[in-house]
Amino acid sequence: MTMITDSLAVVLQRRDWENPGVTQLNRLAAHPPFASWRNSEEARTDRPSQQLRSLNGEWRFAWFPAPEAVPESWLECDLPDADTVVVPSNWQMHGYDAPIYTNVTYPITVNPPFVPAENPTGCYSLTFNIDESWLQEGQTRIIFDGVNSAFHLWCNGRWVGYGQDSRLPSEFDLSAFLHAGENRLAVMVLRWSDGSYLEDQDMWRMSGIFRDVSLLHKPTTQISDFQVTTRFNDDFSRAVLEAEVQMYGELRDELRVTVSLWQGETQVASGTAPFGGEIIDERGGYADRVTLRLNVENPELWSAEIPNLYRAVVELHTADGTLIEAEACDVGFREVRIENGLLLLNGKPLLIRGVNRHEHHPLHGQVMDEQTMVQDILLMKQNNFNAVRCSHYPNHPLWYTLCDRYGLYVVDEANIETHGMVPMNRLTDDPRWLPAMSERVTRMVQRDRNHPSVIIWSLGNESGHGANHDALYRWIKSVDPSRPVQYEGGGADTTATDIICPMYARVDEDQPFPAVPKWSIKKWLSLPGEMRPLILCEYAHAMGNSLGGFAKYWQAFRQYPRLQGGFVWDWVDQSLIKYDENGNPWSAYGGDFGDTPNDRQFCMNGLVFADRTPHPALTEAKHQQQFFQFRLSGRTIEVTSEYLFRHSDNEFLHWMVALDGKPLASGEVPLDVGPQGKQLIELPELPQPESAGQLWLTVRVVQPNATAWSEAGHISAWQQWRLAENLSVTLPSASHAIPQLTTSGTDFCIELGNKRWQFNRQSGFLSQMWIGDEKQLLTPLRDQFTRAPLDNDIGVSEATRIDPNAWVERWKAAGHYQAEAALLQCTADTLADAVLITTAHAWQHQGKTLFISRKTYRIDGHGEMVINVDVAVASDTPHPARIGLTCQLAQVSERVNWLGLGPQENYPDRLTAACFDRWDLPLSDMYTPYVFPSENGLRCGTRELNYGPHQWRGDFQFNISRYSQQQLMETSHRHLLHAEEGTWLNIDGFHMGIGGDDSWSPSVSAEFQLSAGRYHYQLVWCQK
């Protein structure tokens, strides 16, 4: 044990937090989570242990701008002005200091290992009583599961130890410091340490005791470590559970270890042995270790699909059977290996349906509770995710247990990122930083190695490639050869990774960056001598309105076996709740706390909002990742299961044929499909519809029974096919009414019954409509070629740094947002049964014509206005965001009804999950409340739209809401939006894709750009 004086002054003088060679003082060795049961039955059933006591709750807290400002007296007693805070928590969420959001740039001046003298310091204290029996015998430990960034610990005024690495436990022996009665803990937490240089992850930078604190009482002679490994014969019919147990304390001949394996109430196997390890070398073996091997016939294998778990109980006892203590863990029998270029689980090649997940809560910062963790897992499972990457640090210990039990594959990642270093490997190639890096990797492995859900270790994130990585890769492969290791840094295919694991590599497009080219994922597979599997550690950057082009990745994954999926970036928006002057909550992002530097809204890349409400993009991910695929041939549906281990024992296939959303026929068939099997379903002869319209066949896989992660009736997969269109024609009834045209010096006015249309002859726009005496328009109907920029349109542009290649900057530079209409033509003609208005506009900026729009409006005796639009795009202007029409309707109706793709928001390159049907939603649901306002709410493939008294027909896309594109463009946060008068309607003949391969470079695929030069579309606008 390291002994230093208890004096605060001496601790401050040592400055351990600026010494990369000091990562801990007196911290105990890492190990799996312990509970030290004194009853093996309680260990088997995982009941709360009487030897494990939580210290979570209210602690006294005082904040100081620097550690030197902390008074020495604090070690002995609480300060008179100390506050009370809840532990675990981040002190920034209690109003102390400010959270800082930055992606790459370090929040402190880069001068490793030194940190600013103004180093915010939180002083925590807690008084507690200790059970006298704990003082009489054994060892009492204190466990801090997570403290950011570094801390010193005192107990009863005496210095205990020091720890850093904010994402792994720091555990200390308190036995020598405790006494009967009241005891006092004092914890000095520093915001910045040399460890901060290894924790440059894309997240909020927060501080404090943010994970659980507990006391653990162990016997003097104790189990100090145990690890379990499962091994198999070739066909997985026989397995061996290998348990290596290590003890600490007096090594006596009478000591025995028993390992028993349980499946529920049934004991499957058991073995007992004295200590004394196998021979290691010419000097012998470990006297304090023993390895037991239990044979298991026909084990029920663990997978994310069927997370079968056993329970291993490890007992330390004397020869006469007296139990000293027991530890336990869940065991999943599974094998992970790479063979012939494929990542295999239990002999089957995996397809990773993964997502990156930060630990984030909108109210509690980086504090995770069980309810939130379970909510995340349920949502992931419900949306067809089978894997999660712990980006970019080891998670709360409970997370892994939940993943074991619910079934998720886990990439466990070391808390190492040096993204802001120049070059990135400045520290990771420096031997002085090897001890700090080593602790972060080795302690992660030692804590989490017993979890079957952990199938891959990761050496960290975005830290270049250094010699330290190579050393740690070799250490893991030596200590735990049962799992592959991945690491993206230095080009994603270095010697420190078993898996090619690039981030944001595109399907077909190479990105030849200097030193570390990023090949297309298809090309990577074909590089000479390359036989590793490729799994994208990050792809499909889901920032705001994004995930366009997701389907092309999944087409490639299914086409090329060695493309084994990837992890979407990322799961949850990292917005935080703030309150305005009236106490109303709003969602904040980088810079909203006065934090500098900051990367604004780049913290919001989630498939779900911070409160776990899904983004529309989540449905696209669910659909592309679904485990059932469908093919239609005639009246036969072929259903293929992509499950590797599950039989479809809880699925029905529901099918329906509908004409323009009206059901014509339907049925339900139980699915009986084995793993990777097929089933053919023959549909009956379908009735012939009597009217014209689009005929669609929809199939849905429905789970009739609830599961551990879903309710009864859950839809897990679906597909639609458009059948041959019914071409029967219903002729319109003859009309004897003829619209009347009146011409004045300023307007053309057309009147038919109680309806009137007014076209302004100076502007050439439809300026007003009336139904009776009620005006229908607040603004004229006019062309629209722009959208409120998406995050993907903005890229890395900001006020102080313009990226001229970003779509929004190209549109601005070309004048798309500033373009004004110059009238070229506005004429009116009376036809035999209609009035025809013809207009032409040149949309110009600074004398240059960008678009020419020609329209005809034909108003007939039924009151239908047929609008034909022809648009020519200048050859030297950027491809526009949209080609359509916009106006502000006077009405505000509660409901929106449409026949088209829905129900969720969809865009041309993100619509495979949308279904063609007749949908009816509240107006409020037509708007997607992205925290950073942007273009949103589009519905594609629309044939008919009904709103208030109006109906539009054609083949178009639309969005409709209380917010104009202008307001969305000019507003920084959604809570600042105000509902405008009336309703804004945007009807597009064509709309550009949204992209999403990444959010910092143009990523809309060419086929989803509006590059044709000439466009035509038609609408019918009438009143019901």
From Swiss-Prot:
GO CC terms, sorted: beta-galactosidase complex
SMART domains: Bgal_small_N
Binding-site list for substrate: 103, 202, 462, 538-541, 605, 1000
GO terms, biological process: lactose catabolic process
Domain of life: Bacteria
Residues holding Mg(2+) 2: 598
UniProt keyword annotations, A-Z: Glycosidase, Hydrolase, Magnesium, Metal-binding, Sodium
Protein name as annotated: Beta-galactosidase
Organism name: Escherichia coli (strain UTI89 / UPEC)
Gene coding for it: lacZ
